[in-house]
């Protein structure tokens, strides 16, 4: 047993979910915590004989487990909550239509070192045959090639992003889950892991960590039939990729300060450090006069809201609350932006 939290967000897939949980129980290395977010019918599964027995096995295996009735707002919100609820630094994100090979977690851990932000293996649909050379998990190939996880993996590969299921380090997820997406959460895993990569963490694919994707036409995100949600998420995805290109490649950052006067003065303390890291610093300020002598570009909060899909995720007080922050706000600003 390892200090790992397995997280599953589910919606109306209780049969599939039982397969996932049974395959977690039968891992050669077992996580010591399992959290399931139920966004569906929210049944009392203790009344189901299959589930009643699964719960007994979880008890026998000493796996600390809980089922949390979600807000029915989609898996991204549930995954974001898991960052606050999970008791462990390592979190195993698993989809509710997965079937895990018995040694999947053991082999993920084998390659998980201090530089690793997230690590995944093959995510295979039954009776599919993608060729490795035709696949890619590079951001620039996302519209041209199948995902690299859909084909055989025979050695460690360093990639830009992961999808579906992966093991990750909680401290590498300082920005949280992309809760600016719709309930569908289209591109969630890509945005989540690619930002880790941009922050300097290794994102890896490794061999012998197979997960079968028992893709289901109903339940889960396929409960949402609103095509506009997918279009909106795709637009936000492309907007974030362009923002990150500016921030990480051209060293140009936009920071919204939608808070009080004192918070602006606190933020002012880190401007010299920001200028060391970035060539161009733009601040969306409620009190722009605080920065009149700092030689930074200033824009309005309204402009920042139009530019940043993740505007609300960057609120310093929301971030401190999520991260149970106990230090000074200046240190919070440093942690978030430096």
Spans of model-derived segments:
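Short, well-formed alpha-helical segments that are part of the catalytic scaffolds
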Residues: 13-26
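Acidic donor-binding segment of Leloir-type glycosyltransferases
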Residues: 25-68
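Glycine-rich, basic loop-to-helix element that forms the pyrophosphate-binding segment
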Residues: 70-86
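A recurrent flexible, glycine/aromatic-enriched loop bordering the glycosyltransferase active site
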Residues: 76, 148-168
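Short beta-strand-to-loop acidic/aromatic patch adjacent to the donor-nucleotide binding site
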Residues: 89-97
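Conserved donor NDP-sugar-binding/catalytic core segment of glycosyltransferases
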Residues: 105-136
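Acidic donor-binding loop at a coil-to-helix junction in glycosyltransferase catalytic cores
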Residues: 185-192
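Catalytic machinery of carbohydrate-active enzymes
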Residues: 248-338
């Amino acid at each position: 047993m390892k200090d790992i939290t397995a997280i599953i967000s589910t919606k109306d897939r209780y049969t599939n979910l039982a397969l996932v949980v049974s395959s977690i129980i039968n891992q050669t290395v077992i996580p010591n915590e399992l959290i399931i977010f139920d966004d569906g019918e929210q049944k009392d599964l203790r009344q189901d004989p299959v589930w009643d027995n699964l719960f007994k096995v979880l008890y026998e295996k000493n796996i600390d487990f809980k089922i949390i009735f979600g807000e029915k707002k989609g898996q991204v919100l549930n995954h974001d909550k898991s960052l606050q609820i999970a008791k462990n630094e390592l979190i195993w994100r698993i989809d509710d239509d997965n079937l895990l090979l018995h040694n999947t977690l053991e082999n993920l851990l084998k390659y998980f070192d201090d530089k690793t932000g997230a690590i995944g293996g093959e995510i295979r649909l039954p009776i599919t045959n993608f060729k490795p050379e035709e696949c890619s998990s590079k951001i620039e190939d996302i519209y041209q090639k199948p995902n690299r996880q859909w084909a055989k993996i025979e050695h460690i590969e360093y990639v830009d992003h992961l999808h579906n299921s992966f093991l990750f380090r909680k401290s590498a997820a300082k920005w949280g889950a992309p809760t600016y997406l719709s309930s569908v959460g289209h591109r969630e895993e890509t945005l989540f892991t690619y930002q880790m990569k941009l922050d300097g963490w290794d994102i890896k694919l490794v061999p012998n960590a197979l997960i079968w994707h028992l893709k289901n036409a109903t339940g889960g995100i396929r409960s949402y039939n609103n095509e506009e949600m997918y279009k909106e998420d795709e637009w936000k995805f492309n907007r974030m990729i362009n923002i990150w290109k500016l921030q990480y490649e051209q060293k140009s950052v936009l920071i919204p300060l939608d808070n009080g006067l004192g918070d602006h003065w606190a933020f002012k303390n880190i401007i010299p450090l920001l200028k060391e890291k970035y060539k161009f610093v733009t601040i969306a300020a409620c009190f722009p006069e605080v920065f009149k002598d700092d030689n930074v570009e200033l824009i309005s909060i309204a402009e920042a809201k139009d530019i940043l899909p993740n505007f609300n995720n960057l609120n310093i007080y929301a971030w401190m609350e999520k991260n149970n922050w106990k230090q000074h706000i200046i240190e919070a600003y440093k942690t978030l932006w430096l």
